[in-house]
């Protein structure tokens, strides 16, 4: 999304999540992973738009918090009401920190790669 268009980046995020979930057997169920894949599209799309407007730090913060906290809670709500899973707050307590840290690491890596490609004058 930050190297290519936000829409294409979002589609890549969506498909990447589905492929990883498929390889692990959709451990939280197919409906949950479809929701998470759609959330990946949204977070990559929004983060890319903010990044491409030159607000790199804001993009990192928004992407990290949206993916790590916001969408984790939304997924917890979905699991609770649709699938009868654990309380959404407990789901967030369980997964919020590790997913937020993973999101931060992924976003920092994407920003570094983007800067490296830009400095090397490589266009994708």
Where are these regions (language model features)?
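Loop-helix junctions at membrane interfaces
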Residues: 1-124
